[in-house]
């Protein structure tokens, strides 16, 4: 069961916040290894088409920094946003490999496809039948952002960010409209704030 220790651990972003001992282990913020776990949504078993909306609170592209605090903000943004884009790149590569396996399977006689040595590998190709649409929004900052904003939970800051997020989401949804991936496709629509963003 989840208790207050688990909540504390979820905020244990070292070195800013300490780890929390749980069951004999020191536990830290899961975002340190996977801040935006896309695999949990996109790799889940199933054959139905899927629309995934991912919100990345950190941006790859940001303003110039002039102070130590701004430099630390930028460092944190780069560390965490890079995780998201590496995960996205890996998912795209995996989808392409599966697509190629499916094409390969079509060229192999049915009797050979039943060979256990081939069957498990070729089965991976069946995971590309569904259509996958990913809408990925990165937070672009707000005018009143403070230094070390990742740790600013004041009411004015949160209100400003929530409103910016609401407007950015509305703009992104209006931009893609009814666009969806076709069967077998993995399509990504990226936005940095409210603006379309080039993706890896």
Predicted regions and their residues:
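Non-catalytic peripheral regions of patatin-like phospholipases
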Residues: 1-3, 22-27, 31-200
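Conserved catalytic cysteine-centered active-site region
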Residues: 14-22
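Active-site capping/gating segments
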Residues: 6
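Short helix- or helix-capping micro-motifs
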Residues: 9-10
């Amino acid at each position: 069961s989840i208790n207050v220790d688990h909540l504390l651990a979820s905020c244990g972003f070292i070195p800013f916040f300490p780890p929390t001992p749980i069951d004999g282990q020191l536990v830290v913020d899961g975002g340190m290894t996977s801040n935006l776990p896309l695999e949990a949504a996109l790799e889940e078993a199933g054959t139905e088409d899927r629309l995934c909306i991912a919100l990345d609170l950190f941006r790859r592209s940001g303003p110039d920094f002039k102070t130590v605090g701004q430099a630390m903000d930028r460092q944190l943004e780069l560390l965490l946003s890079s995780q998201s884009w590496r995960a996205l790149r890996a998912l795209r590569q995996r989808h392409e490999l599966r697509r190629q396996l499916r094409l390969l399977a079509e060229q192999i006689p049915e009797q050979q496809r039943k060979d256990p040595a081939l069957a498990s590998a070729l089965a991976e190709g069946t995971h590309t039948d569904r259509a996958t649409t990913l809408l990925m929004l990165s937070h672009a900052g707000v005018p009143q952002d403070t230094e070390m904003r990742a740790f600013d939970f004041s009411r004015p800051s949160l209100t400003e960010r929530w409103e910016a997020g609401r407007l950015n989401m509305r703009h992104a949804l209006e931009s893609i409209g009814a666009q969806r991936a076709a069967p077998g496709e993995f399509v990504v629509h990226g936005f940095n704030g409210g603006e379309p963003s080039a993706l890896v």
